[in-house]
Structure formats: structure tokens, C-alpha cells
Amino acid sequence: MYKKSEIEIEVLPANEGDCILITIEKEDIYILIDGGTAETYRNYLKTRLIQLRNEGKEIDLLIVTHIDNDHIGGIIELLKENGSDMDSKIIRIKNIWHNSYRHLQFDKNQTLGKSEKNILNKIIANGEVSLNYNVGKSSPISAIQGTTLAGLIFEGYYHWNEQSEGQAIINNGINYQFGKECFISVLKPNISDLEKLGKKWKIDLKKSKYSFVFSEDKLFDDAFEYYCRCMLTDGNGNNEKICYSNHNTEEMTIEEISREPMSEDNSITNRSSISVIIRYRNKKLLFLADNIADDVLEYLSQEDRGYSLVKLPHHGSANNISDDFVERIESDTYLVSTNSEKYNHPDIETLAKIACKRTEYVKRIYFNYKIDKVADFEKKIYGMNDIEFVYLGEGQKIYL
């Protein structure tokens, strides 16, 4: 939290989501990872981006990790107001990384028929109804208006996945260079992840029509996005598939909590989210989106054990992190982005795993909201010399 070097991390209030701005000062590089909800954009992100624009700055890279309302809602609002790459009203965005329908790994060279169009239009219409119902319960003014992220990127002529020549952003062993000394490598997704996501999409569509044909028509992009945004919800916008920790930890020791068994997250969209390592000089930052930590481990070499910062996957869900990951990864700075209100993240089991790892250095876990159950758990770690919780106030940053 105290300025000591050349990287700044701003974790904007994003309710249950992510909106993270990374600044590499010496090279004037700005990286935005996700945009939280529409409310995040209106209340925080827009003001910050206009401030950067007025200082003559640009966003060098916008990473939209996956199609989920608490990650893309703010980006949709930003791109609506921003206009186009050639005439940016809010701020110039030089590159966007985002995997959409067009990046799924299967043939799409057929001709779209009338019945397929009707089915896709129904998916879009049902998606708008479902999302408006869900959003309206928490923020009545942020109604979904039928605009998709993929459509806005395409119609705004933004540089979309340009580093991979317009193809999917995947783990391909390449270190993408930004500026002189900043390099970004992709850990997830891999081709298999996108194939599985595409397979599920095809199976579900063929339930409506067995011989469903697939094309490059924009209608597919829009329908796929609504499909992913509603994949975790029922018709009323209620979450069906996220597993919650429901252990009563009040009378348990930290060690007992850390050993509580959890079910691994089986969400295909989460496993397809973009996780990256950002390297600058001697620093490495690990951003795990909503991925599963063990899926990432297989891509990390022994040299990749130490990190200046680890953004915990899926807002600190115990279903996305394991003992093996905590033991293998060395870091003194962890980050959790959530207000805990919708999905009850972070899980106390995750915090206990990190607290129970004995280190000669102090491990700091940063939160962008004060959360009651985290404060209660903090009482359990009182007196431990190698763990500290830090609550970021509005405008406060992490300095690395």
C-alpha cells in the first residue's frame, strides 16, 4: 500500500466482480483487466479513465477475461460511450483481448437458415429478459439494452486480439511485449478449453434443432454472449451452479478450516477465462481471473514460483484454489476483489490456506471491500506474525 517502486494496482469497487487498473509508470503503460458491472463504470471507472485521458494517457491493453456479468458489464458501458477506436470519447484503447464466439474452435462456414435465426433471436430475447430481471434487483437503473461486447468491439473497429493475428487469445508460449520491458504471457485458456466451451454451445443448440448449422453471422456472436452471461442462472436470474462454502467455522481452528474439503469449480466459462502473467523488470504479477488454480499450475515452471502479486482466482472461492497451489506459489501480496454480497466470496477456507502457510516474510491479503466474515476470521489470525489483512479505501492503491 505504501509506494516503493514502479507498478501501481488500482482495484476499483466492482461489487462481486473485477475491475483492475495496472500502471507501469516508467513506461507510461496502462492495462485494464475487466470492468466490473455497469454500476462500476458509472460510479468509478469512467471518472478514472477521463482523468487519464485528460493527462494524455491511453489504455495500452484491455483484457476482458471472460463473458460474465460482473466482469463485462462495465466494459459494455465504456464501449457504448467511447464510440470507436478512431474517435474515442472517453479514452483511446489501443488493444483489446477478448474471446468470443468467433474464436471458438469449430467450423462456421455454413449458411444460416431461417429456423436457426429464430432460435438465436429467442436466445437473445430470453437473455435480455433474464439479465434485466437480475440486474434490476440490485440496480434498477442499469437495464440491459441488447448491446453485446463483441458487437461493440467489432463495430468500433478496435484492435481485437491483434497480437494473435485476430485469433483466440490462448496459451501459446508467446511473451507479448508492451513497451520496452513489459511482457505478458497467457496461461489460460488453452485450445481444449475453448473446444469444450464450443462443444457445450453446439450441444445445447442442437437440443432446439438437431441439424443446427453454424456460420460467421453476427447473430451467433450476440446469442453466444447472452448464452454465456446466462449460463449460470435460471430463468429468474438466480445463480444455480456456483458452489458455496457452508461450513460452520466459528468453533474451528485455522488449521481445521484450511483442511475442509471443497468441490472443484466445474464452470466451463470460468475455465475458459484469460489468466496472465505480467512481467516488468524483476517483478511478476499473476492474474487468475475466474480460473481454477490447479489448471494453471501445470503451465508454471520452477522458475515461476515467486510473484510480486497474486490475484486470487474467482474472488477467493475455495472451489478454485488448492493446497498444492498455495504451497507451490510464493508471494507476499494477494488480492481479493469482491463485496461478498451476492456469492459470499471469499471463502474462509481460502484465507485459512494462505494463513497456514508458514513463511519468513509477511503475507498481505488486500481486499477492496470490508467484509464482515473476513473481519471475524481476522480475529483468529491475531498474533500470527506472517499474515496481515489490508482493506483498500477508495482511491488507495497497491504499490509494487
Q: Which positions does each model-derived feature cover?
A:
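C-terminal regulatory/interaction regions
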Residues: 1-7, 15-18, 278-281, 291-309, ...
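Flexible, acidic/histidine-containing loops and adjacent segments that form or flank the divalent-metal
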Residues: 2-3, 83-281, 363, 380-400
